[in-house]
């Protein structure tokens, strides 16, 4: 057998040995859960509706994500603003898909995220550490933190100017109101409540939020 035939034979054997290994590596890669791209903030900023504007809310999401090991991504809070230069929450969170901290896909795109298409509910709306928020669903009828600040209509767009839905564009910890969604999709114990636009709060203090089942928590999305 000449040298050329020997080389061909060796290459054939190596191909038989290597290709299955590459296939296994590819399969392992396919089986890896997607990177976290969504979470409910585990804690609030703590100053009622004064989040420091959109920038302050985004920084809060980024800080929590970084502490949880996902600081390599760019994070934004799902919040709208009103009035001149109004911002739509849906326009500031990227295009998806987004997975929670357990690797479950919350929504594949903006279309699937809104209305009743998303996977946002008490089971899957986890915080950045993989924990569930307090809800009446878990057995305590008198305590819930399912109200999540959004200032947003059901389709993810901003409310028109007029009645405050954003605590003065997330700068007020006193007067005004914030539109919230129910992350567990329940109103008391009745299912079907929107995750992003359920009701307004009676004011913008931290105490106002707590009084109606909230804590000033945020939805955080990876934009990249």
Q: Model features per residue range: what roles?
A:
Residues 9-21:
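Bacterial N-terminal signal peptides
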Residues 23-224:
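Secreted/extracellular ectodomain signature
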Residues 1-10:
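Bacterial N-terminal signal peptides that target proteins for export
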Residues 7, 18, 64-67:
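Short intrinsically disordered, low-complexity coil segments enriched in acidic
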């Amino acid at each position: 057998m000449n040298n050329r035939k020997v080389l061909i034979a060796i290459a054939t054997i190596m191909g038989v040995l290597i290709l299955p290994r590459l296939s296994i590596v590819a399969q392992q890669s396919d089986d890896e859960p997607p990177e976290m791209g969504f979470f409910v903030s585990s804690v609030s900023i703590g100053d009622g509706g004064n989040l420091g504007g959109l920038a302050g809310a985004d920084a809060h999401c980024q800080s929590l994500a970084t502490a949880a090991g996902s600081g390599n991504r760019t994070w934004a809070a799902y919040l709208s603003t009103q009035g001149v230069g109004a911002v739509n929450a849906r326009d500031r969170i990227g295009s998806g898909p987004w997975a929670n901290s357990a690797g479950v896909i919350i929504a594949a795109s903006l279309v699937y995220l809104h209305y009743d298409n998303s996977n946002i509910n008490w089971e899957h709306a986890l915080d950045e550490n993989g924990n569930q928020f307090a809800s009446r669903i878990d057995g305590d009828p008198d305590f819930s933190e399912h109200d999540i600040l959004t200032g947003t209509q059901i389709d993810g767009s901003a409310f028109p100017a007029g009645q405050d839905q954003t605590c003065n564009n997330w700068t007020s910890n006193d007067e005004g109101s914030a539109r919230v969604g129910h992350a567990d999709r329940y109103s008391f114990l009745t299912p079907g409540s929107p995750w992003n636009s359920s009701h307004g709060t009676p004011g913008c203090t931290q105490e106002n939020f707590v009084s109606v089942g909230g804590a000033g928590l945020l939805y955080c999305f990876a934009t990249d």
